[in-house]
A protein has these predicted regions:
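Conserved small/polar residues in nucleotide/adenosyl-binding loops
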Residues: 171-175
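GST superfamily/GST-like fold recognition
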Residues: 143-169
Length: 175
């Protein structure tokens, strides 16, 4: 395979990238990394020492949304970002908002060093954000309407892990 994804099997950010690669029907290799005993080369490839990391020949990318946008541009079918620049910019803004409003709390829950108090606050914040999001998406097939998009991919791994995180199970929020 020409692409290698360094990934944590339970890491929601890695799962986003796996999702996109499978959605594109790509030939790629997954190298699962033990998130608590990372090999040294992870720090060489990503100065933040985090997965996912995508390697394709001389290109090394990290940060799930950046990796996924690259894959989407490189292999345009099926297209996961809107073709229109205005809609694409709106989608990027929504992805950014998801990171700031929801996924910063996911980082807290994924981090073993987080205090119990921080975890409780993170769970509440995630619950509040998803509850706020629910009415907007309740009548749509996907987050952006009828089209499956990068936003669905960004959010899906969180929804899969809600029970694990100890947040309320959102039976009405189906992806």
């Amino acid at each position: 395979p020409m692409m290698v994804l360094y990934s944590g099997s339970t890491d929601p950010f890695s799962q986003r990238c796996r999702f996109v690669l499978f959605e594109k029907g790509m030939d790629f290799e997954i190298r699962d990394i033990d998130l608590y005993h990372k090999p040294e080369d992870i720090n060489v490839m990503n100065p933040y020492g985090e997965v996912p990391i995508l390697v394709e020949r001389d290109l090394v990318l990290y940060e799930s949304n950046i990796i996924n946008e690259y894959i989407d541009e490189r292999f345009p079918h099926p297209q996961l970002m809107p073709p229109d620049p205005v809609e694409r910019a709106r989608t990027r803004l929504l992805l950014f908002n998801l990171e700031r409003e929801i996924f910063k709390h996911v980082h807290t829950l994924e981090n073993r060093a987080s205090s119990d108090e921080a975890r409780v606050k993170a769970r509440e914040a995630i619950r509040d954000q998803l509850t706020g999001l629910a009415p907007a998406v309740a009548k749509k097939k996907y987050l952006m309407g009828d089209e499956f998009s990068m936003l669905d991919i960004a959010l899906a791994p969180l929804l899969w892990r809600l029970n694990y995180y100890g947040t309320v199970s959102y039976t009405h929020l189906t992806l």
